[in-house]
């Protein structure tokens, strides 16, 4: 345990299904009793995580007019300025919440122009918007996304086993899967009621993988109304279940 947030070592997954069975029970406890976990030995290189954080800094260090030129498109890809979003519909949100004090750059799975979903103009499968003034930004971010996506897929058999399902159960739902990757910047703000970097919320997706930094601020609710700080664990990811898996 790490301050009551389960800490799970994914090293056994290197042994395939035998390893998945080793961590299934711990995964079941984490997801059914807490809803969050911290994973280590996940296979995502520490230097790749550090480089991706640096790419996020490079992006947000650009002048505001440059970022506005990359504003979000109809697929929710691109730049979202600070104060343009707040949470009002989540079951854990607050009535007095103000617009989030963060800016962010969003992207989704990179697909070629001849991809069937792109040709069909499927919502959220459309083009990403890439900055042109940041050499190697696109390549490094895609590399990171590919590695994290592969890590998440390695976790699926253990997740299925933790729910007493066949180990390949979730594969059918991820044959043509989607993800959303967010590079956020949280500027310093004054303490004020209803003002958050990002307001209390639940994620609508299947699972979220958040690489930890040594800057505090992230809190989770393990029980209704009971919030706690997430402890920093070097070279780890915080994982939370989304509304899709919850259902």
Which positions does each model-derived feature cover?
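Peripheral, non-catalytic segments flanking oxidoreductase cores
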Residues: 1-247
């Amino acid at each position: 345990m790490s301050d009551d947030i389960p800490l799970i070592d994914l090293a056994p997954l290197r042994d395939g299904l035998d390893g998945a069975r080793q961590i299934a029970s711990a995964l079941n406890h984490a997801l059914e009793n807490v809803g969050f976990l911290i994973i280590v030995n996940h296979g995502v290189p520490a230097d790749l995580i550090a480089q991706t954080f640096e790419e996020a800094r490079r992006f947000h260090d650009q002048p505001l007019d440059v970022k506005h030129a990359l504003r979000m498109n109809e697929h929710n890809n691109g730049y979202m300025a600070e104060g343009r979003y707040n949470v009002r519909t989540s079951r854990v949100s607050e009535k007095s919440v103000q617009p989030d004090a963060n800016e962010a750059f969003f992207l989704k799975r990179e697909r070629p122009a001849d991809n069937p979903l792109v040709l069909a103009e499927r919502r959220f499968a459309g083009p990403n918007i890439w900055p042109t003034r940041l050499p190697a930004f696109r390549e490094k971010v895609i590399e990171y996304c590919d590695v994290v996506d592969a890590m998440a897929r390695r976790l699926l058999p253990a997740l299925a086993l933790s729910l007493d399902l066949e180990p390949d159960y979730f594969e059918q739902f991820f044959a043509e899967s989607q993800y959303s990757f967010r590079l956020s910047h949280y500027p310093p703000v004054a303490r004020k009621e209803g003002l958050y970097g990002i307001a209390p919320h639940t994620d609508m997706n299947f699972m979220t993988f958040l690489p930890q930094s040594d800057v505090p601020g992230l809190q989770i609710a393990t029980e209704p109304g009971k919030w706690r700080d997430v402890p920093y664990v070097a070279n780890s990811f915080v994982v939370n279940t989304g509304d899709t898996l919850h259902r």
